């Protein structure tokens, strides 16, 4: 395929047009008075959203050179979303500001490489200043504030802080669509896995169709149990203790299952059998997790263990187990806390080294099951369009909250960027590197300017007053008042704030140092097929 090539100023100006189109579309959503953007979908109702990365991903421009500029900014939003989970609109605004100021200087004859070095040095200084201004997030109220700011809903803030309190910072919090109109929180404490009882005759509550075992022993094996004789010695020993038994095995079939069911119905023995969760190597890992959580041992050929030789000492224990037709929940396992902590540390290191998104997600689920539980926020709304928009906001809020717990918070509303201006201005750089520093100084003002503009105020006036105010004082665009931002609950996670700036500077520098752009030539429209002469007979 033939290529179109543009050089120097012509190449950069084409890309900048694309940057501006995308950024101008996204930045109207910034701040508490940010507007919505309506996205046409190929089927179903349009999506109404103020989520920066969702909007950025939808934009495709006809001009190939402009589209490349737009896609680079979209990459900034996506990367910020991947790292911090929020701050995508801020990252887009910062990218546009750095590109706009940088292009003026490059066009005037400045060396783009020198400018790039200056930008990198200024951003590094700004990031260090942001980190030093950080306030740790330690209590439930602070977590609720972070979530409320991101989602623009105090109720959502309460749900997220409650969920994190219940399942811990490493716990799994999932967001699902509710069947009703109300948003609600459902917390499953303990370890849950998606395997239910193998026979409905094992239930202890016929009305709810669940089996509840109090203080049970837990047999954990990756073997298939077909012959009851294999576990008979173990069953006889458990029978003497008068305690129930949960069997987690590859499968229970043959004569073993009906024998267990018969003894359960007769009241001889309270037992529930479930299949082991997962598949392949993941199944082995999950069985090991269950064993560590409950203080048991996995009966497996890998360790040279046989079912017929198993003793009560090899069984796990828990305060309660609940099993329904689809899932099993183990509450308060009797495992050694130190062994559990070591297992958690191993899984965390696997998450960090994993390159697969799917593997990382599964490892995160295992981590949550070991360290707390699972919380589900069920989102309710009057219409499908509102539901989609609400779900996106809650996802952003959850990500922002996790980021806040990780690295702390700073004043929100763009104030944190104004508070680091002095640190950046104190950086002694000369020539084009000094120009790069000045570009960052101007760009750091842009989020506040845009938030004020979206709320109907003059950005320059707000910035001038901010520069002369005490550190921590900022402009509440929602009310038009000047307040202590952290005390007023207007806060941003440091991780979000710094990621937005770092990613914006990285991509903007690439655009400024671009000297040639290569794009595919548009394909010529195929000519209409010639008409069959026989079709013209009636036209004479």
UniProtKB/Swiss-Prot annotation:
Task: Check the record and name the SUPFAM superfamilies matching this protein.
Answer: GroEL apical domain-like (SSF52029), GroEL equatorial domain-like (SSF48592), GroEL-intermediate domain like (SSF54849)
Catalytic activity, as annotated: ATP + H2O + a folded polypeptide = ADP + phosphate + an unfolded polypeptide
Show the Pfam families listed in the entry.
Answer: Cpn60_TCP1 (PF00118)
BP-aspect Gene Ontology terms: protein refolding
Q: Which GO terms describe its cellular component?
A: cytoplasm
The entry marks the following residues as binding ATP, namely: 29-32, 86-90, 413, 476-478, 492
Superkingdom of source: Bacteria
- Record's keyword terms, sorted: ATP-binding, Chaperone, Cytoplasm, Isomerase, Nucleotide-binding
Which terms does the record give in the GO molecular function aspect? ATP binding; ATP-dependent protein folding chaperone; isomerase activity; unfolded protein binding
* Major place of residence: cytoplasm
Q: Which InterPro entries match?
A: Chaperonin_Cpn60_CS (IPR018370), Cpn60/GroEL (IPR001844), Cpn60/GroEL/TCP-1 (IPR002423), GroEL-like_apical_dom_sf (IPR027409), GROEL-like_equatorial_sf (IPR027413), TCP-1-like_intermed_sf (IPR027410)
Coiled-coil segments on the chain, per record: none
Record-listed E.C. numbers: 5.6.1.7
Q: Name the top EC class.
A: isomerase
Q: Does the keyword Nucleotide-binding apply?
A: yes
| Localization annotation | Cytoplasm
Question: Is Chaperone there in the keyword field?
Answer: yes
| Assigned protein family | Belongs to the chaperonin (HSP60) family.
Function of the molecule: Together with its co-chaperonin GroES, plays an essential role in assisting protein folding. The GroEL-GroES system forms a nano-cage that allows encapsulation of the non-native substrate proteins and provides a physical environment optimized to promote and accelerate protein folding.
| NCBIfam families membership | GroEL, PRK00013.1, PRK12849.1, PRK12850.1, PRK12851.1
Record-given protein name: Chaperonin GroEL
* Organism from which the protein derives: Streptococcus sanguinis (strain SK36)
- GN (gene name): groEL
